[in-house]
Amino acid sequence: MKKKHLYLLIATLTVAAVLPIIILVCFSSANEPQRPVTIIYRNTEYAYKEFLTGCVLSCLKTLDEPPADDESEGINAVAVALDCSLRYLHSAGKSFDSGYPYVEYMDEKESIQHFGAETGIYRKYAEHSAEYAISLDLTVQEGTAFLPVCRISSGITISPEDSGNPFVKKLYCEKDKSAEYYHSTCQLTADGIAEIMLTAYPSLIIPPDESKWISDIRRDADGNALRLNVCGIDMSCEEFRRLFDIRSPAFEMSYTQRLYSFDIRGDGCNSGMSVYSALMLSKRGYSCREILNEFYAL
């Protein structure tokens, strides 16, 4: 074999061996997992436990009714996953409120507006689960990892290959379809799309054909959007959903008379743990650790 061919073969084998490690590193940190004392989120500083509590509350906001004691193991599992993700974001030097991956937080004012008179019940479970997660201090492969949580899946979660996160599992969460907030609709006006895109991309030149502003949607085998083109910008579905407040990557889209309409299934990233299914497992007697193992490759 000629030397140059031998070198090429060695280089190819080296890349093939290293690539899975590169993907793993993108969603994990093997350093000693440090928990920050405070977190800056949207220019406000929060004590860590308070912030974790607010993240748990955000995950509970689509429940049909306040949680009960037989759902506490599921809520604990949610808090543990969020705590691990927060420590990963901190150790990786990533922002908590921008880019991807990221977390969602519900402050005290928003929780009162959403839960009303039942706020105290929700907060009791959220605070207890935050304390549990901090005391457990879960590590993944001797480090931290981003463990995504969605409130309600569309029935089929995104695979680790398509999500790029080796710690998630592809699951069929059929019971999520019975959740009250499983289905939703959303509309975006052409003017609204232009305003949002110009705010995010000030130098963007908006194309003239409004009917093609959102196009080239690339999906996985189950129909979940992975990437798409918006006004000439190729972006991930996560960025698109964050910009336009689309609840789930499982959506169908139509355009008519300067209006984009979305028919959406599920609520959240549609990858990793479904809160709705986690609470169902808790009711069936699953422990926190058993629930985590259902959704993540730990």
Where are these regions (language model features)?
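Conserved, single-site charged/polar hotspot
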Residues: 1-298
